[in-house]
Amino acid sequence: MGDFGAAERRILEFMSKGTEFVFNGKGYTVMLSGKPTCHKGEPKTDIYILAESCEDEVEIKISYKKENADFIENKMSAERAEQLFGEDWIDIIEQSTTAIQDKFYERMLIYKNGFRRTEKGSITLGWKFELLNKSGGDLSGKMLLTDEQVVDVYAGSNLSSDKKNASVCGQTIRDSGVANYILMDENVYSAQDVIDKMIPIREYVMMHPDIYFACKALNYRTFAEKWDGNRPLSVQVNWDAINNRLVPELVFDKPLIVKGDEVAERLIHYMRKLNIRTTEDIDEDNSGTDKIV
C-alpha cells in the first residue's frame, strides 16, 4: 500500500460520505470521515468515521499501524509518557528500568576504542526510552503494566484534552482522538475490507498483552565534542570528580526529567577540571570506573 500517509488517505477515500458498509450485522452509511488533528502532536485516532443505520449511530476510531512497525513510541518525553501512562508515569518507567538495572551496571561507559556500533571516543550520558511491541536489544524489557494500562496506551485514554477532543473536518468532536479500533492489515481494498479487518483495541490487547521498552545510549563524542541533542533520558549517568577521578553514578529515579544537555554539560565541566579533553586523556590515574573499553 506504499507509504504510511498514502495508506491512511486511501482508507479515508474508501470511507467517503455516503459509503455503505455492514458492521455488526447492520447496514451503515458514512456521515462524516476524516483524520483527527490537534494544534500540537497527534491524537491516537488516525481515521475517524461517523456512520448511521436506520436504528443508531456508530463512531469508529481507528489507530492504523503498519504490520511491520515495531515502535509504539520512539521519542519518549515526560509529557508523552504522562499522556500514555497517566499520573503514575514516573513510577511505571522507574520500575521497568530498575527491573533490568543489572544490565545497565554491566554496560561500558567510556569507549577509548570503538565497540559494536559505538564510536571511539564516546562517553555515555544516559539512555533514551522507546516503546516497542516486541523486545529490542540488550537494554530491553517488558513494561510492568496492567491490561487496562496497555489498553490506555493503544487507545490514548490519558492524552491531553486537545488530543482527545480533536478536530475532524474543521469541527471539534469529543473523544475523537481516543481510538477504539486498531488496523494492522495493509491489504484493504474497500470500506467493507476496513470494517472486516479492524480489531477492537481491547480484543487486540487480549491477543498482544505485552508492551516492551528499549533504552538506547546517548553518548558524548569527545573527539567531535558533540552529542545527539537534548534528549530526555530514562536513566542518567551522573558524572562527578571525586579524589581527582572521573566517577559515574547511574540515576534511575528521574526518568525523562533530566535531559542530554544537562548531563553533557556536567560531564564536560568535570572533564575540564581533570584536564581531560578526549578519552585518550583518560587513564587509571584519573578514572574512577572500570567500565572502559
What is the predicted function of each stretch?
Residues 227-293:
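Charge-dense, extended regions
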Residues 1-17, 37-40, 105:
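A short, highly charged nucleic-acid-interacting micro-segment common to nuclease
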Residues 2, 19, 23, 57-248, ...:
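Catalytic cores of nucleic-acid endonucleases
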Residues 4, 11-12, 48-49, 61-65:
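Generic hydrophobic/packing signal
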Residues 10, 56-57:
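Generic structural microfeature
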Residues 17-53:
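A short acidic/basic microdomain associated with nuclease active sites
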